[in-house]
Amino acid sequence: MAYKKGQQRLHFMRVLRNLQIYNTIINLFYKSIIESVLCFSITIWYDKLTVKDKGKLKKIVRTASKMKTKVTSLDDLYDRNVIQTVKKIIADEQHPLNDNYVFLRSGRRLALSAQRTDRFKKTFVPKSVKLYNHSVGS
């Protein structure tokens, strides 16, 4: 779905480029129209995509980058959105997942709970804790 919508929006970006519109306007178009389609609920579905589907979405980003646009890779967009989501969950005491995010004694990194099954390891909480800790550590 995101691939199809992204391709449709790329058409309009090509039209803007062919009309020799300033690059700043094309960048703004990419950020507001195409990137917003690609980022819609990316924290939920991006990690579950097959390599083939990720390749299709990355093709849209590559095509946009060839049009002299400043683009952010899908992996970076996913990481950024997951970290933002974790920060929102930590800040909201009423959030159902708030109890899963506990800081270590240092107060900087999050504790990773014990994971007995692969099924749990592949869920949002453990992956988001790892991403958050990696972002804080670097």
Predicted features, each with a name:
Residues 1-138:
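Hydrophobic/basic alpha-helical segments
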